Regions:
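Glycine-rich portal/gate segments that line the openings of hydrophobic small-molecule binding cavities
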Residues: 40-88, 141-144, 148-155
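A short, structured loop/turn motif at beta-sheet edges
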Residues: 16, 74-81, 99-108
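Generic structural detector for well-ordered beta-strands
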Residues: 9-13, 40, 58, 72, ...
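Beta-strand elements of well-folded, non-transmembrane domains
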Residues: 12-14, 61-63, 75, 90, ...
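Short, surface-exposed coil-to-beta transition loops
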Residues: 5-7, 66-70, 92-96
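Beta-strand/loop substructures that line and gate deep hydrophobic ligand-binding cavities in soluble
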Residues: 86-137
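Hydrophobic ligand-binding cavity/cleft-lining segments
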Residues: 1-46, 50
Length: 156
């Protein structure tokens, strides 16, 4: 079965420190996740993210069926990137890289997600119709929410 990938970029007129502080705090995930996902963090979270950190959530990704999701923060390079990997949850495979880099008048965020649906060939068949479509919706929501929070990016 194939591992699929999705890449999304967004530019924000904030400093690298401001963007890092926002994206590296798991507490902000709920704010940039659509309400219909029923996203709830179960884990008590420290102020700072660290490699090896385990975060447990409840989500409702499809058909209003609540699921547990557990991710591990596997890599952290402050003000540059972090990686979360699913340890248990709705995907057979989930690897999400969050990169940020300084650009003129702000920061460019790059998300790279590699994922695979469960259920073998059935999961593979529904991936483009349901899974990829749902991920696109979630990232579109996040894109618009970040504009709402921090404004439209302006180069000059």
């Amino acid at each position: 079965m194939a591992i699929h990938s999705l890449q999304k970029t967004q530019k924000i007129n904030l400093s690298i420190s401001e963007v890092w502080d926002f994206i590296s705090s798991p507490k902000n995930l709920k704010e940039i996740t659509p309400d219909y996902m029923g996203f709830e963090i179960i884990t008590d979270l420290p102020e700072k993210m660290y490699a090896g950190q385990i975060i447990q959530y409840k989500v409702t990704p499809l058909l209003n069926i609540p699921m547990s999701w557990c991710t591990e923060i596997t890599h952290v390079k402050e003000h540059e990137y972090f990686v979360d990997e699913q340890r248990q949850g709705p995907y057979k495979f989930w690897h999400h890289q969050h990169h940020i880099k300084p650009i003129k008048n702000g920061v460019e965020m790059l998300d790279i997600v590699h994922y695979q649906a469960p259920f073998g060939i059935i999961g593979e068949l529904v991936t483009p119709l349901i899974v990829t479509k749902k991920l696109e919706e979630i990232f579109e929501y996040r894109f618009n929410k970040l504009i709402q929070l921090f404004g439209e990016y302006k180069e000059g």
